[in-house]
Design a protein with these regions (language model features):
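Solvent-exposed soluble domains appended to multi-pass membrane proteins
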Residues: 1-361, 365-420
Length: 420
C-alpha cells in the first residue's frame, strides 16, 4: 500500500524532528496540550489528573500565549471540536489567548464516517487568525480528525489506503479507518505548509502527535519500543539548522523559542537555563508548586496574567435583512452564520433552522415593530460564546444598534461545569 504520510515524511527528511514523549496513551489530548502550552510536567500532578478540568479552568495560568503576548504577538487558539470540550474555552481564556475559534464558529462541511470534523477546515481559519493582526502571531491549533473510536466494520467505501496482513477482520477495519484519516490529515499538513509559504512571512510551524491511538498496541509493536512516544517536526522558512533530537512535550515550546532566540516565560526560561543540570527535575517540581499552589515567589508580586480577556471567534455575525415567508415565519439573512447560530428576539431563543452561512429560517416567530433581534453562537449547555449587535425590527427592516455586540474585551461568561 502507498505511504500514508508523504508530507510528514518529507518534512522529517529536511527539518528538525524526533520522538516526542507524551504523558498519556490512547487518550488524554488535553494533558499533552497542557505540557506544551505551560512547560509543566504532568508527573507532578495527581494520578489521572487533567489540569484542564481542575486548575486551569478556574485559575489564570502562565503559558506560551502570555510569554509571546508580552513580546507583542497576537495569540490565537483553534479547535475543530466544540468550545466546551475539555473546558477549553475557560482554559484558553485563563492562559491569556486573545481569541479562540472553536467548531461553533466553523462551517464544517466534511466529516469522518464517525462524525468528527475533517482537518481541512482548519487551514482557512489559521490564515484568518493571522490576518486579524498586523504584528506577529502565535496560533495554537488542535485537530480532531484522527479521534477514536475506530469502527470494527468497514465504513469507508473506497479507501485510499488499504490495510493487509491482519487476520482479525475487526482489527483490520479499525486500522484501515485510522490510517485513512492519517492520510487525509497528512494532506492537511501539506496544504497548511503551502498556505504559509504563500504568505511569504517569516514563519515556524510545529507539528506534534498528542498520543498513540487506542489500538491495543504493545511496546514491541513500535519502532521506538515505547508507548508514550509520538513524533514532532519543526518546519520553518527562515533557515533554521536541522537538529534532530528526542524531547518530552513539556520542553517543546522552550526548545522552539530557544532556536528563535526568544527568552520569555518563567517555565520556558527555566528549561532553557537548567535543562540537563543537577536537580533540574526536582527544582522544576518546586517551581510548578510555587506557581500553581504556593505563594508565587517567582513572580515577585507581578504575575504574568491575573485574568483572561479572550474573545470567542474571529468574525462578527452581521444581519442584513429579514423576509416574511409565504405561510408563517421569516428568513433571516446576514453573514457568518454557522449551524451553531441561534436567533434571539427580545432575549428569547427562537426555534430556527440553519440553511447556510447567509440564511437562517424562523418557522414559528412572529415579529412586531420594536422587537430586538440578535444572533448568538451557542455551545453545549446553552453557553453563549458570542453575540451579534442588536437589530430593531421596524417596518419590515432591520435597524442596527451600533456597538451592542458582545463586549470585545471578553465574549462570554465563564462556565463552572465540565463538558468533555
Amino acid at each position: 500500500s502507498e505511504d500514508a504520510c508523504p508530507n510528514l515524511h518529507n518534512l522529517y527528511q529536511n527539518y528538525s524532528n524526533g520522538y516526542f514523549k507524551v504523558p498519556s496513551v490512547g487518550a488524554g489530548t488535553a494533558n499533552t496540550e497542557f505540557e506544551v502550552l505551560t512547560g509543566m510536567n504532568l508527573r507532578y500532578f495527581g494520578p489521572g489528573e487533567y489540569p484542564y478540568k481542575t486548575y486551569s479552568k478556574k485559575h489564570p495560568t502562565e503559558s506560551a500565549a502570555t510569554a509571546l503576548a508580552s513580546l507583542g504577538y497576537g495569540t490565537h487558539a483553534l479547535h475543530d471540536n466544540t468550545g466546551n470540550f475539555y473546558s477549553r474555552a475557560n482554559v484558553f481564556n485563563n492562559m491569556g489567548f486573545d481569541t479562540f475559534t472553536s467548531k461553533e464558529f466553523m462551517n464544517v462541511l466534511q466529516t469522518t464516517e464517525n462524525g468528527w470534523a475533517k482537518d481541512e477546515i482548519l487551514t482557512q481559519h489559521i490564515m484568518e487568525a493571522m490576518d486579524t493582526t498586523k504584528q506577529e502571531d502565535f496560533v495554537f491549533t488542535v485537530s480532531v480528525q484522527g479521534h477514536g473510536n475506530y469502527p470494527e466494520t468497514q465504513v469507508i467505501e473506497n479507501p485510499k489506503i488499504k490495510v493487509e496482513g491482519i487476520e482479525d477482520e475487526a482489527l483490520k477495519n479499525k486500522w484501515e479507518y485510522y490510517v485513512n484519516q492519517v492520510y487525509e490529515m497528512d494532506q492537511f499538513v501539506g496544504d497548511l505548509i503551502k498556505a504559509v509559504e504563500e504568505r511569504n512571512e517569516p514563519s515556524v510551524v510545529v507539528f506534534y502527535g498528542d498520543h498513540l491511538p487506542t489500538m491495543g498496541l504493545k511496546a514491541e509493536d513500535l519502532k521506538s519500543r515505547y508507548l508514550y512516544n509520538t513524533n514532532y517536526v519543526i518546519w520553518d522558512n527562515i533557515g533554521l539548522q536541522k537538529d534532530d533530537k528526542n524531547i518530552p512535550a513539556y520542553q517543546l515550546m522552550s526548545e522552539v523559542l530557544n532556536r528563535l532566540d526568544i527568552h520569555s516565560g518563567t517555565v520556558f526560561n527555566y528549561h532553557q537555563q537548567r535543562k540537563g543540570t543537577k536537580n533540574y527535575l526536582s527544582d522544576l517540581e518546586l517551581l510548578q508548586y510555587d506557581i500553581l499552589y504556593g505563594k508565587q515567589y517567582v513572580y515577585n508580586g507581578k504575575a504574568p496574567i491575573t485574568e483572561g480577556h479572550m474573545v470567542m471567534g474571529i468574525r462578527n455575525v452581521s444581519l442584513s435583512s429579514i423576509v416574511p415567508q409565504l405561510n408563517s415565519g421569516y428568513s433571516l439573512y446576514g453573514e457568518n452564520f454557522t449551524k451553531y447560530s441561534r436567533v434571539y428576539v427580545n432575549g428569547e431563543k427562537q426555534k430556527s433552522s440553519f440553511l447556510n452561512n447567509t440564511r437562517i429560517n424562523l418557522s414559528e416567530t412572529e415579529l412586531k415593530d420594536g422587537d430586538v433581534i440578535q444572533v448568538g453562537q451557542v455551545g453545549s449547555s446553552d453557553t453563549i460564546f458570542r453575540m451579534s449587535d442588536k437589530y430593531t425590527y421596524q417596518n419590515g427592516q432591520l435597524v442596527k444598534q451600533e456597538g451592542t455586540a458582545t463586549d470585545k474585551s471578553k465574549s462570554w461568561v465563564d462556565q463552572d461545569y465540565d463538558v468533555n
